[in-house]
Amino acid sequence: DRLRSRGLGDVYKRQILPNLLNPFFSMVAHYINRALVNRGYRMLLCDTEYDYTKEREMVQMVAQNKVDGIIALTYNPDLKIPPDVRSVSIDRYLSGSTTCVASDNYNGGRLAAQKLVENGCKNLAFLRIGSPLTSETNKRRDGFVAECEAMQLPCTQKILMDDAPLSEFEHFLEENLKDGRLAFDGIFCVTDKLAVAVIKMLRRMGQRVPEDVQVIGYDGLRAFGDQDYYCSTIIQPVEAMAETCVELVLGETNPNTPSLLCLPVRYAYGGTTKA
């Protein structure tokens, strides 16, 4: 009942990702592929370009070819996976018994607030662009805001949907600039990708990072994959998440696995905070 290549005897798992141009998605694909290869499996990678129709087509192909399992990172809340196909999702909730694997987003948000305050910040901001769908990534904001409230610190928020232009963040920053000073001195961005864009905006406005404004992202992305961090960041344990996904989809774990597995995160200095 397994899909095999022409006479080679390779066993396949399929991974569905929305877009490989996103460096976090590429990192996820890398580690999942490595975990599968180490177990004698091969990965069929589906880059769906955020197209729900393509995702459905990929799942139909899985059902027809009897691929062993699916590891999905999808923005489609209505994606249906056949009940006889083992499946795992990353960060998103799928219907049925599919387990969701994620980093500890809530505590990651709390940690970002703590680090900004430890580095002397007194007025914080949270910036996010993303899907309106319910997902584990939403908890980054929840944890950050909760920690700000616990420390009795002001927290300004700017949240955009996926289709909004990034220039709206620049307008937001400009609106909070008075006499050459920004209204907040610490910013937590929902991803490293957004953090890098915001840092460029700040510097265009004459704001020094980290001297005037400190910025923390989320993901743990490195330049060229293995060099310096793009920014100070909350690191997702992507390799451990990939191993967990593979263990689940291969049935190597306890059959009574909970519907959500959260893996611990950590902070790393990347030059956009004071320490």
PLM regions and their residue ranges:
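Single conserved hydrophobic/aromatic residue that forms the stacking wall/gate
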Residues: D1-Y12
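Alpha-helical recognition/docking segments in bacterial nutrient-uptake
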Residues: R14-Q114, L177-K178, L182
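Hinge/beta->alpha junction and helix N-cap segments in small-molecule ligand-binding domains
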Residues: P18-M27, C46-K54, V101-L111, L127-E174, ...
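Short acidic/polar active-site loop segments enriched in Thr and Asp
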Residues: D68, C121-L124, D185
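Short beta-strand and adjacent tight-turn residues that come in two discontinuous sequence segments
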Residues: A72, F126-L127
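Flexible loop/turn connectors
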Residues: E174-A275
